[in-house]
A protein has these predicted regions:
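A short acidic, glycine/proline-enriched capping/turn motif at secondary-structure boundaries
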Residues: 87, 113, 122-124
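Conserved, mostly hydrophobic/aromatic
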Residues: 117
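Signal peptide processing junction and immediate N-terminal pro/mature segment
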Residues: 21-24
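Bacterial N-terminal signal peptides
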Residues: 8-19
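Positively charged n-region of N-terminal signal peptides that target proteins for export
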Residues: 1-5
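Signature for the C-terminal beta-barrel architecture of outer-membrane proteins
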Residues: 26-63, 71-101, 109, 135-236
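Surface-exposed extracellular loop regions of Gram-negative outer-membrane beta-barrel proteins
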Residues: 121-128, 132
């Protein structure tokens, strides 16, 4: 998901900014369990001005707000994020309007294995064929909701398999399905001679399959059917 930063300097003058509020906290105990959280609020009071054609606004305040809470321990992590964007900031796509819990996960680790169930972000290699991330200021959040398994058989070798649906605003039923596998090998971690010489050598391989259903694009008086491949594979 993305939006175009459409607030030009002239248009920005028609808005009274609410000071951005962002607070983070960390609470830890002697039992090895820690809690991390944050709250963020960005808002504007829109003012209508016919001279610069700001248009009409249905609400007295426009804002995006987020609240995160994560529990971290030796073997199990869990967390969730609540978003309230009922009246999103100008420049964000209308489909952003809404609220809910778009990110919730549980992660377990044991003897080289790491299993995640829920929403997560991942990047294979340089991110050429798979990169999911969140950038709130740009309106980007393409997280994957599903499962991911990581395995490190030896130091320097990392294997990953995953599958799930990609976030599309607030409707996961219309989201595309993503499946993938990745292998990364850090040669210098396997070779003492390379480490002694200060050399670094990494090799990797990735495979991603994306599945999307057919789409009907409705136009006045016509019905266009978009013919695209349902399954698109990629290698890197």
């Amino acid at each position: 998901m993305r939006h175009t930063p459409a607030i030009a300097s002239l248009l920005a003058a028609a808005f009274m900014a609410v000071p951005a509020v962002s607070r983070a906290f960390t609470v830890g105990g002697d039992n090895g369990v820690a809690f991390h959280g944050s709250v963020q609020f960005d808002g504007l009071f829109p003012e209508e001005d016919e001279a610069i054609e700001t248009g009409k606004f249905d609400h007295k305040i426009l804002f995006n707000s987020y609240a995160d809470l994560n529990m971290i321990s030796k073997y199990v992590d869990a967390g969730a994020r609540v978003e309230f964007m009922k009246w999103p900031l100008p420049g964000y796509e209308p489909d952003f309007a809404g609220w809910g819990v778009p990110n919730i996960y549980v992660k377990g680790r044991y003897k080289g294995f790491e299993l995640t169930a829920g929403d997560f972000y991942e990047q294979f290699g340089s991110g050429f064929i798979l990169r999911t991330y969140q950038e709130r200021s740009l309106g980007i959040d393409n997280s994957i909701r599903g499962g991911r398994l990581k395995y490190q058989p030896v130091q320097g070798v990392n294997l990953t398999v995953l599958g799930g649906v990609q976030r599309r605003y607030w409707d996961w039923k219309k989201s595309s399905q993503v499946y993938g596998a990745n292998a990364d090998i850090n040669i210098e971690e396997l070779s003492k001679s390379l480490r002694d010489k200060g050399w670094g050598w990494n090799v990797g391989a990735s495979y991603v399959l994306k599945h999307e259903d057919d789409q009907n694009i409705m136009m006045p008086g016509t019905d266009y059917r978009l013919h695209v491949p349902k399954n698109v594979p990629a290698w890197d």
